[in-house]
């Protein structure tokens, strides 16, 4: 992903728009397939920035800046803004908006897909998130080597409620458990369809994600790997998730790798697959968690499982 120099967006790039419309209208056709719904309500935009607790020394990552309605407000508070945008037309609009102003020196525009790009360090993330990257963005932010202190993100309302869901809630899922392990999540505001241009088909909500410090002393991928198994059928017993051939094959392979690192071998006459199955069944039975349903299990119960599996040499990533 390359930095977008200002000169790239001068001249013809600023005059032309999708569908042959002229730049003088300051309007081009939004690509809703990319989740382009511009936040037009200045009060909502200011509320998002205010909730981000930006310090004068902060570098802020903005995902999907669009035409810059949030960006210009972030620039007033932050030391630097890195805006990641896939659409060159949007990048052109944003560049033009700050051109010749003091804020121009504080803004770096990166063209490309935020999910596929290695990101530089940043303190805060703000995003009017394209809905199709909601889950990948959350996981990418939490799995950064140095996760942002605060993320204030706009999502489809139902997705936002999944982040906040508790055991027993209908929306409680792997995402809920995962995010709440690494961060405190709070609801900032609900945002109606009429606050966007063009209006999306659903209501939106803004959430604030504040990472835990210190970070929980578990491996991100191990935790996520366990939850993937447990939530394959969240309303079935956890036992059921560990009986699929695909899951057993992965755990058997990982167990074999663990044995090699420990300098151990399977006793002659033993079947590795049977050994792994026996270990899994013993853990699920001894903890009493095997007969529980993931939809009703809390963080403590999943942590108990992960610790017991690791003691037995069974890993998930």
Swiss-Prot record:
Ranges annotated as spanning the membrane: none
Record PROSITE patterns: RRNA_A_DIMETH, SAM_RNA_A_N6_MT
GO BP terms: rRNA methylation
Tree of life domain: Eukaryota
Enzyme class: transferase
Record keywords: Methyltransferase, RNA-binding, rRNA processing, S-adenosyl-L-methionine, Transferase
Binding site for S-adenosyl-L-methionine: 37, 39, 64, 85, 113, 128
Family of the protein in this entry: Belongs to the class I-like SAM-binding methyltransferase superfamily. rRNA adenine N(6)-methyltransferase family.
Listed name of the protein: Dimethyladenosine transferase
Organism (species): Yarrowia lipolytica (strain CLIB 122 / E 150)
